């Protein structure tokens, strides 16, 4: 079976080899060519066409059907596309046999107007071929000549006529035409005119057979159409009631048809019987074929490829395509080619190689966690890695791993050894776990930092005593919340709380938690979202009596989201919040429920309800609770302290500034005991002699200057507690200092030089310190060792191994470079 080339007009002819040979030899005969030409002229002769129509009309009347041939008269031509694959032309023609247009005043509308009825006649589509082998389709829509005349005078009537013609073709033949890019051509008719047929039944029906005529032995001639019913002539079709007029909407740009083909380069090595031979699942190239039947050249279109998105825009004709590609491509090596014959744009895009991310090997500093340098990161919980109890876990962070910690949104110290991230400790509260994260100062080498070292009380000494203090947080009241308590210190690369909760250090595709400040009055809450350039149309909020959720985006296409939650006794009103947006921030006003008016104590904030952080309002109750923590020491004292004088200087949302001054305490009893021992003849130790030498230049009252607790912006309860513990330890250490400096009466000659050196070191006229909890400087308290009288160990028994005599030593002081963790270790000296 022979076929021509694909571009040949004869590609659809199904001819055998014998038929092709016979046609070839016949057209070589001049006589056959003359007869074939006469046959073609007879078919196109108008007179023969008229005689054909008369015979068809007479034959149809014998069956009781009236046939009328509708010859289209040229009007104007619309060019569009058919199903997005080929060109299509619609001839808007006229004929007097079609009903005339009519109109009536519009009803049921506030705008006065008229409703038009436009009868039309349709002819089946005809296919034609271009000289290059491409095909197009032509449809004829015939109206009354009056409708064409009105369309020539009124532009809006012409638009309505064209829209009616396109809609009629789509509904009748089930095709899709491109209305957006329909264009009126200058020609009046496209293709060869072909008459349509109007068939209507005669009023009297089919004529009866004559009485004397015998019946034909042959069956009736097969007829392609059913004869209309007898009662059909009586039922005159009435036009349907016109639908109410709708606002004419400009159609959107047309989305062209496209196909995406994944192309692989076949290599026989990938099909060997071996484990390492397997064809890759990722293709080498993506071939995108876009059908643009109305596009003449590639200059009329703009193509842009970025990553996994292909964008195509064209004005005339109006095309718009936004195609999401299955794989990221390398747009720098892509190529596009426009096929004018098929009106196709073929885009070939190489697939970008996937960049594998090797996991960084754990360094020895990271593998072996030194004491006091363990870190805890709560950012993983904000990304959904926390369990049902909201437990936050993190890896250890050291100096070499600062880059990885910055990517995870974890605060790292600027100077090593000044500030370290404390290890997260998980404690059991009623079957639930919470995670507390804080920072602490690392003591210098040689200073004791053990829990028993009272003189150098670092933060590690208070972690074991926080069981009662943590009840202030949300663990005991709200066991399902993951509490993250932080101490943010100035000057050490301060990181906002939202960075650890999914801030700019997180992945690009995830939502970020914005910085937020919350203030209150008795009837409402005011939220200040410190994010610039917020898009108003992107705000999506939801209000519940116990929580409030909001998500939005900025002009930089950064997505933010946060979640607020309150305790069951504090409820919000469900009315719509008031939102005010400026170029720098956004202010949201939430109303409190009428039965919950007043000042609230706490609120919970985070990226979602699985990672919430407790924050406290600045009110009188919270300040009083903080002052109580300052006054109460973290451990039991051996000697009663005179209550210090507390003066609150400043209370703000981010800072609490107080002045604590110790009152004068009399050491007459201690001095009296020393005097008695000296007069009795008991020798004084070298330490006591030194202390006595310095007592004359030391005032009996010590004061702690202004202590500023720079709380985290979140105002978490654990931050306040940790600051209270530091102040308490500091007050206790200062109260013990005058006790260690007691009077002396004599000094031995052999230790004069050593005593003078100790005297210079221990001489402190007025101990005045000013410290902020910022982690920049090592605590001066860690460099001091307070010598105290230990009850129950006022003497030591020493046995002589030679004669077995026992010597009782009442005053015994040992100098060492380390600190004992337990007082019982004195017996081993």
Curated annotation (Swiss-Prot):
Residues carrying Phosphoserine: 450, 632
InterPro entries (UniProt xref): Kintoun, PIH1/Kintoun_subfamily, PIH1_N, PIH1D1/2/3_CS-like
Low complexity: bias regions: 352-371
Single Gene Ontology BP annotation: in utero embryonic development
Record GO cellular component, one term: protein folding chaperone complex
Localization of this protein: Cytoplasm; Dynein axonemal particle
Self-association state and partner proteins as the record states: Interacts with CFAP300. Interacts with DNAI2 and HSPA1A. Interacts with DNAAF4. Interacts with DNAAF6/PIH1D3.
PANTHER family recorded: PIH1 DOMAIN-CONTAINING PROTEIN 1, PROTEIN KINTOUN
Function recorded in the entry: Required for cytoplasmic pre-assembly of axonemal dyneins, thereby playing a central role in motility in cilia and flagella. Involved in pre-assembly of dynein arm complexes in the cytoplasm before intraflagellar transport loads them for the ciliary compartment.
Record protein name field: Protein kintoun
Organism placement in taxonomy: Eukaryota, Metazoa, Chordata, Craniata, Vertebrata
Gene assigned in the entry: DNAAF2
